[in-house]
Amino acid sequence: MIRVAINGYGRIGRSILRALYESGKRQQIQIVAINELAKPEAIIHLTQYDTTHGRFQHKVKLVDNHMLIGDDAIKILHEPDAAKLPWREMDIDIVYEATGVILDRQSCEAHIHAGAKQVLISHPSSADVDGTIVYGVNHDLLRAEHTVVSNASCTTNCIVPVIDVLDKHFGVKSGAITTIHSAMNDQQVIDAYHDDLRRTRAAGQSIIPVDTKLARGIERILPHMKDKFEAISVRVPTINVTAIDLSVTLAKTVDIASVNQVLELAANGRFNGILGYTDEPLVSCDFNHDPRSSIVDGTQTRVSAGQLVKLLLWCDNEWGFANRMLDTSLAMIAAKQS
């Protein structure tokens, strides 16, 4: 049984916990502790009730500063200094680092010094970590000596499996990406101050361009794609589910049918459970709570002049990513034991 702690219990932290109990992986992973500065009553309430994902299927109680879920008792901590967390006493195997602010190796090593054996960051990180993993594409690169690992981003997990499939079958020469991302909690409900002037504006009233390092994230997973991609991102007034508009120039001549065929085969084969394919007339809310990293919308595939291909990809940027955190942590332990 893997003993884990969650540091930072926001959207991703809570999704990880709920996904654990829904995914069937509870027999492999035990959440021992949650470190979050919010009041315990709010932690319990937001675990039980969620606007995006609905009510949690298990009853959650607060008893003696523990979250009780069935027979599981999860210690709730409120320690702002990661170096002071009781990971050694709790025998923590992996910390899910989900604060969104501890992103480099030096900061994450506070968890290691506190006694945790490994750290998995729920965010793109600095380049000095042991590895950045997109589960299903490069998790086989994990090694026993890896202690600090990044799970990349939700959009990197969405797009990289698709690029990998296209490159292996047709060769990818270059690409351009537009991420159409749901609003996030770094935006404002009504106009308010922010360092990014666009993010001073009300999230529910505008399509808001934001910076993205998605193209660099692709390079980290697929180094041979260096300088082949550029990306932009906009936030839209929805609370969950992201779409990615992917345009790629291929080395081989293709048509819509051949592109969709290889992606559907990959979804049913090598990337089963990670990549999906649909030809139904669906909209973004239909992918809410979908555990897969990416779903190709085959109805929107377009081909121009035989080599320029446009695809539409969907992902639940919370739930899909939370499920990959579970998968990557299991792969980290497997690598450590091999």
From Swiss-Prot:
Coiled-coil portions: none
Site entry (Activates thiol group during catalysis), positions: H181
Q: Which residues bind NAD(+)?
A: R11, I12, N317
Q: Return the Gene3D superfamilies for the record.
A: Dihydrodipicolinate Reductase, domain 2 (3.30.360.10), NAD(P)-binding Rossmann-like Domain (3.40.50.720)
Q: What subcellular locations does the record give?
A: Cytoplasm
Pathway-wise, it operates in:
Cofactor biosynthesis; pyridoxine 5'-phosphate biosynthesis; pyridoxine 5'-phosphate from D-erythrose 4-phosphate: step 1/5
- UniProt cross-references to SMART domains, sorted A to Z: Gp_dh_N (SM00846)
Q: What catalytic activity is recorded? A: D-erythrose 4-phosphate + NAD(+) + H2O = 4-phospho-D-erythronate + NADH + 2 H(+)
| Enzyme Commission no | 1.2.1.72
Where are the active-site residues found? C154
Main subcellular location: cytoplasm
Query: HAMAP family from the entry?
Result: E4P_dehydrog
Please state which protein family the record places this protein in.
Belongs to the glyceraldehyde-3-phosphate dehydrogenase family. Epd subfamily.
Subunit arrangement?
Homotetramer.
> What role is this protein assigned?
Catalyzes the NAD-dependent conversion of D-erythrose 4-phosphate to 4-phosphoerythronate.
- For this entry, the protein name equals D-erythrose-4-phosphate dehydrogenase
Q: Could you tell me which species this protein originates from?
A: Shewanella sp. (strain W3-18-1)
